[in-house]
Swiss-Prot record:
Belongs to the glutathione peroxidase family. GO terms for biological process: angiogenesis involved in wound healing; arachidonate metabolic process; biological process involved in interaction with symbiont; blood vessel endothelial cell migration; cell redox homeostasis; cellular response to oxidative stress; endothelial cell development; epigenetic regulation of gene expression. Its main location: cytoplasm. This is Glutathione peroxidase 1. The modification N6-acetyllysine is found at K91, K117, K124, K151. It comes from Bos taurus. The record marks U52 as: Subject to oxidation and hydroselenide loss to dehydroalanine. One of its GO terms (molecular function) is glutathione peroxidase activity. Homotetramer. Interacts with MIEN1. The keyword Repeat does not apply. Its EC number is 1.11.1.9, 1.11.1.12.
Length: 205
């Protein structure tokens, strides 16, 4: 366990094991948004980038899930991050136009909440992602997923539970507890059965 992991573990042990302890500033600006306001919702959290090879696929699938399952209690949350191949190098105020006119383009507008750019690995990692990585150290579909190309590692320290690329996914249950982590190779749309299971649990609670 690296020093950052030990620190995160100590923090996690001292705090509730839910995402409700965290907040983030919306991409549109304004006051920090408290995730505690989403109690009872199923959350799908992804680190996103507007210039990635899977931007079109993942953004449109995130929109699709939010459109169809949002009325039943799903909330999709996107966190732009520039740590992987510098593929989110736009300023916060430029990201929506990049999505609208470049990728996915064609007037695309996300129907889910986007937050300001943040880091997900290293000393400056957003506390939410430090927490998610500690609770779910590896993707369930690929426990060996790692960033293996040194030229793309721009953060320090490097930890075994680091996010390895854009569009890793974290699924959180209606009680705020992280349930499952998926690699970048796992299609966003294929998380739907797991989301359905959690939505059913929430409805019967």
């Amino acid at each position: 366990m690296c020093a950052a992991q030990r620190s995160a573990a100590a923090l996690a042990a001292a705090a509730p094991r839910t995402v409700y302890a965290f907040s983030a500033r919306p991409l549109a600006g304004g006051e920090p948004f408290n995730l505690s306001s989403l109690r009872g919702k199923v959350l799908l959290i992804e680190n996103v980038a507007s210039l990635u090879g899977t931007t079109v696929r993942d953004y449109t699938q995130m929109n699709d899930l939010q459109r169809r399952l949002g009325p039943r209690g799903l909330v999709v949350l996107g966190f732009p991050c520039n740590q992987f191949g510098h593929q989110e190098n736009a300023k916060n105020e430029e990201i929506l136009n990049c999505l609208k006119y470049v990728r996915p383009g064609g007037g695309f507008e996300p129907n889910f909440m986007l937050f300001e750019k943040c880091e997900v690995n290293g000393e400056k990692a957003h506390p939410l992602f430090a927490f998610l990585r500690e609770v779910l150290p590896t993707p369930s579909d690929d426990a060996t997923a790692l960033m293996t190309d040194p030229k793309f590692i721009t953060w320090s320290p490097v930890c075994r539970n680091d996010v390895s690329w854009n569009f890793e996914k974290f699924l959180v249950g209606p009680d705020g507890v992280p349930v499952r982590r998926y690699s970048r190779r796992f299609l966003t749309i294929d998380i739907e059965p797991d989301i359905e299971t959690l939505l059913s649990q929430g409805a019967s609670a």
